[in-house]
């Protein structure tokens, strides 16, 4: 069974594909444009190409976590999620949305400390974990660097967390 992991945003969407336990593809889509709506429209064809190439049976995508703060970011992430969901629906591929804690916790990315829950720390740990498990050389420069490859590592680990749980195909427990 082929499964795909997606870590979506309006600036960079990471993706990964596994065939069984084997990581067979991964990458990032970084669309051009200053407006998030334009970037979103430009992401679509690239994501469709990846789906057509790998033909995943199921997709796991990070859900938008509801938290206090930036309402605009929630609106944008919700739009990104809906847009990508529409693309996957056109291929009739089932999608399951996972909250960050649902895929990070089983992989040991939370260490129980307040420091360990900071975004930059979690992104850095994601890169280290993906590099360790899959023998990759994904890059982490600094918390604010645009050269960080955490979108790719997150997409890989989103899918991998479900392989580890052997959940693909089974309904999510409530």
Residue ranges and their predicted role:
Residues 1-174:
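Phosphate- and other anionic-substrate recognition elements at nucleic-acid/protein interfaces
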